Amino acid sequence: MINAVEARTLNYYLTLNYPITIYPDSDGGYVAQIKDLAGCLTQEETIEETIQNINEARDLWLETVYELGRKIPLPID
């Protein structure tokens, strides 16, 4: 029997709001990280590029983990 947690679709996870942390990199540019998704981070020269890339990284992280059948954590506020 599948419970509600197991029945969640990839689209469900893609619509969740995972908090993003952005900070300046000591070598220049910015680093963005989603702490709820282990290893989901990116580095770019501008804040705009950093935001765009962390959103792409989040989607790829979620798609990969979902396809592997692993547990996806929910966002922590």
Describe these PLM feature segments.
Residues 38-48:
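A short, exposed loop/beta-hairpin motif centered on an aromatic-Gly-Thr core
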Residues 1-19, 23, 52-77:
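Short, charged, surface-exposed hinge/linker loops at domain edges
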Residues 31, 41, 71:
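Gly/Ser/Thr-rich beta-alpha loop segments that engage phosphate groups in nucleotides
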Residues 22-37:
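Short aromatic-glycine-(Arg/Gly/Cys) micro-motifs in beta-strand/loop hairpins
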